[in-house]
A protein has these predicted regions:
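Glycine-rich portal/gate segments that line the openings of hydrophobic small-molecule binding cavities
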Residues: 118-185
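Residue-level detector of alpha-helical recognition elements and their boundaries
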Residues: 114-115, 200-202, 258
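Beta-strand/loop substructures that line and gate deep hydrophobic ligand-binding cavities in soluble
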Residues: 3-18, 175-234
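Hydrophobic ligand-binding cavity/cleft-lining segments
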Residues: 2, 8, 12-14, 20, ...
Length: 272
């Protein structure tokens, strides 16, 4: 775990191996992780979000409307014992083509999934099957077993009709367990909605923890430990801030490389 009361312990990340250092992207691993905006740091503090500010899954269409800017950031445990968080990250200077480039770049298995490790040094391990990362409570195996698309969410219209600023969505119903403990599963439904702004892009990431997707609905699987929900929100906030921090420079750096630095053997399971 590399978070200490919302502070990313960058000085504790493991060094790169001599093989890792052969990657043209190795220098980006050394770039210190930038903290989220002060308002987001406040939102992932110990105080839980008021239930009245939760985006219920039955109202998920709000995420795809212009009014989504009014959604409140934060985390909480819902009355039924499941968890919730929503994190908004502005990504100034990030273009749509850079956002579309990113998923294939992080999935490259070369140099021991170094690209994925660059994203969150010391927390991200590999992007295979399963994905291995530390969500804040130890190295976990993450499985995304049900991709989610706008067509599955019961929206009243196409996302681009609901909001012309809409760029794309990546969502899934998944589960994770601490390595070596497959009996301790945490279920999560995660939806990341990306839109254009005047200065770049904005991503809003909503998490429903303790549930799984089934027949168009969220079905409760287990209660959620408040500490875990808060740590998940913290991890989420740092992930997207780190992406906003690195992406423009990474994309420009790779421009002179064959295939813009992407591994042609990597195929995306979900396309933005």
């Amino acid at each position: 775990m590399k978070f200490d009361d919302r502070v990313y312990q960058f000085d504790a990340v493991p060094p790169l191996s001599s093989e890792d250092l052969k990657s043209p992207f190795a220098r980006f691993y050394q770039v210190p992780v930038m903290a989220p905006a002060p308002a987001i740091l406040a939102a992932i503090g110990p105080e839980q979000l008021d239930i009245s500010n939760v985006l219920a899954f039955s109202k998920i269409e709000w995420l795809f409307r212009p009014e989504s800017t009014a959604l409140k950031n934060g985390w909480c445990i819902l009355p039924d014992g499941t968890g919730y968080s929503l994190i908004t990250t502005d990504m100034p200077g990030v273009a749509v083509e850079e956002e579309q480039w990113w998923p294939q770049w992080i999935m490259d298995p070369d140099f021991g999934y170094l690209n994925y490790r660059i994203w969150m040094p010391g927390l991200h391990v590999s992007h295979g099957t399963p994905i291995v990362e530390d969500l804040g409570w130890g190295a976990s195996e993450v499985q995304m077993f049900q991709p989610l698309f706008p067509q599955l969410l019961g929206l009243s219209a196409e996302p681009k009709t609901l909001d012309p600023a809409y760029v794309g969505m990546i969502g899934s119903s998944g589960r994770s367990n601490l390595q070596g403990h497959p009996e301790q599963m945490d279920y999560t439904v995660l939806i990341n909605c990306v839109k254009q702004t005047e200065t770049g892009l904005r991503v809003q990431s909503v998490c429903y923890m303790g549930v799984k997707w089934q027949d168009g609905q969220l079905v409760k699987v287990h209660d959620v430990d408040p500490a875990k929900q808060r740590l998940f929100a913290t991890h989420n906030a740092y992930e997207f801030q780190r992406k906003a921090q690195l992406l423009p420079e990474l994309y420009a750096f790779s421009a002179s490389m064959p295939n813009h630095g992407l591994n042609p053997n990597v195929r995306l399971p979900i396309k933005l």
